[in-house]
Amino acid sequence: MLSLHRMRALLVKFRTMQVNQLRGLLYEFGATFRTGRAAGLAEIRARTAELEDAIPGTMMCCLQDQLRRIEELQLDIDLLEKRIGVWQKQDAACHAITAIPGIGRLTATALVATMGDAKAFRSGREFAAFLGLVPRQSGTGGKVRLGPMSKRGDPYVRTLLIHGARSVMYNAKVPTPWQRDIQARRPANVAAVALASKIARTAWAILARGQEYQRDYVSVRPA
């Protein structure tokens, strides 16, 4: 499964390079387009007739070739995502953690494949540390100082979790008390990493303990 994710990530990287190169080519002729990949490409296609009048024939052929390459890459990406989606629907673990806000098809499959046996980790915090989503600790004389996140583990999975956390923060109609508190006390990026860590710990708890996701669940340390 992780191999499919690696292949998809590489194709997305190639697609981004092709789109940026296309924008640069058109910018040389004074043509600018809306930001965003989908919106920009749609505008380029809609303005093809206009571009033909402003761009030499040879360069217009290059532009059309570039658009075809981007379309082919998109088809390959869509196919890989379809295969990942089939696996996600058939796998009970992926299905269970997809209920967590911030975890979609890509994150669920990558997280389950990375985690393996959830019981190999003693706690959700240990799993979050494995992914590099906990702060570094330092200090002397019994005083512990928390630094930036360790960034250990797989950067791809960590990035998926952070993107998912940002989506939750920006789109939640009714944020949980925890989310409201962390967003009020911390900068947006720090809050996103903290929420990503919480999402990872929640996923571990569901898989290690065989629980279902409960939005209002609050963990309590034993006395």
Describe the function of each predicted region.
Residues 141-142, 146, 179-223:
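Low-complexity, acidic/Ser/Thr- and charged residue-rich accessory regions of DNA metabolism proteins
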Residues 2-5, 9, 16-23, 60, ...:
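Non-catalytic, well-ordered alpha-helical scaffold segments
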Residues 18-22, 77-78, 116-120, 166-174, ...:
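Short helix-capping/linker segments at secondary-structure and domain boundaries
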Residues 36, 88-89, 119-120, 171, ...:
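Short, surface-exposed helix-loop/turn micro-motifs enriched in polar/charged residues
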